[in-house]
Design a protein with these regions (language model features):
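Accessory terminal and edge-of-domain segments that mediate assembly/interaction
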Residues: 6-127
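A glycine-rich, hydrophobic loop/mini-helix early in the fold
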Residues: 1
């Protein structure tokens, strides 16, 4: 399973969970961040609860909740690639993240300037 986990200040970390002792040892050997505790809900939680006899692995990337997070997706793919050694190219997602983040910053700046202008006009009207 691949999921995002809300983080107020994402640092690009990906946490991994498994119910298999053998897989846990492999994850540790590869330097993966092992999930110590978390609140997991939805289909992933259901799968985890029902997987008593089936080994599972979950990758949980820190994300900015509420906006598409290409950077978190790239970090999740990077972690999966590190674990499986598939040589997946995650760089296009990082490029897309840069483009999206730049557009988002420009939009926020534009909205901020519009709000300041609106406030200035309101003060001019009352003052």
């Amino acid at each position: 399973s691949i999921e995002g986990v809300n983080s107020p200040n994402p640092q690009g970390r990906v946490y991994v969970y498994t119910n298999s002792k053998d897989e846990l040892e492999q994850l540790r050997k590869k330097g993966m961040n092992i999930m110590q505790e978390a609140m997991i809900v939805g289909p992933t939680a259901a799968l985890m609860l029902l997987s008593h006899n089936t080994p599972i692995i979950g990758f949980f990337a820190e994300t900015n909740i509420g906006i598409p997070d290409s950077r978190a997706a790239a970090e999740a793919i990077k972690a999966i690639d590190k674990y499986l050694g598939l040589k997946i190219d995650y760089k296009p997602l990082l490029k897309q993240a840069e483009i999206f983040e730049k557009s988002l910053r420009e939009l926020i700046d534009k909205a901020s300037r519009a709000q300041e202008e609106k406030e200035k006009k309101r003060l001019d009207y009352f003052g």
